[in-house]
């Protein structure tokens, strides 16, 4: 299972998202200090009812908690766009 599949599986199980997009932007960071570790840079757009009435900072903490160990082993940087469904 590649990194995007790992992230997708965790986020789908944790948040039952209405929308989920995961973009690997690692190629944009080749040569940067953080890229030397081999970990990835990702952009995630996720929309879930579980975010309703939850401040943005708490939504991000929820995602970080769900991703858990992947933040140490596979993810160097992650940009989050957390929304509630329309």
Regions flagged by a language model, labelled:
Residues 2-57, 69-86:
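Contiguous, often N-terminal, cationic amphipathic patches that form binding interfaces
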